[in-house]
Amino acid sequence: MDVDDDAIDIMLENARSLGVEGKVVPMCEEITNVGNIEADLVLCNPPWGKQKHGADSKFIKSIKNLCLPTYLLHSSSARHVEAEFLRSGWQVQKLLTLPFDLGAVYPHHTRRRMSTDATLWRLTPPWLSAPDRS
């Protein structure tokens, strides 16, 4: 799911090269406009909110409402991601941290390119991470 048609095209090209195109359903849509969907997994790279505090909050809320396993790429300096999901009973795993190159795409970007650290989180909803009590 993405609001950028070019990103959807790249995702489809990558899925084809990996031989999984039949398992990927692209959606060109804002995550906040999506109700219940049938999916195995959500991949999310929201605005990080460095320029505008809370820019990611609607994405975090939508992920929690979808209640599906999610991989979330977010700024490594964001401390609220882990706490927000743990507070809601989700299982949270920090998978890796890596440099993330950014081109100047927004008016507030003053440099042509920069790099920042990003963390990839695996977020598992409570219904999947609850212990078996049978």
Q: Which residues does each predicted region cover?
A:
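Class I S-adenosyl-L-methionine-dependent methyltransferase catalytic core
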Residues: 1-134
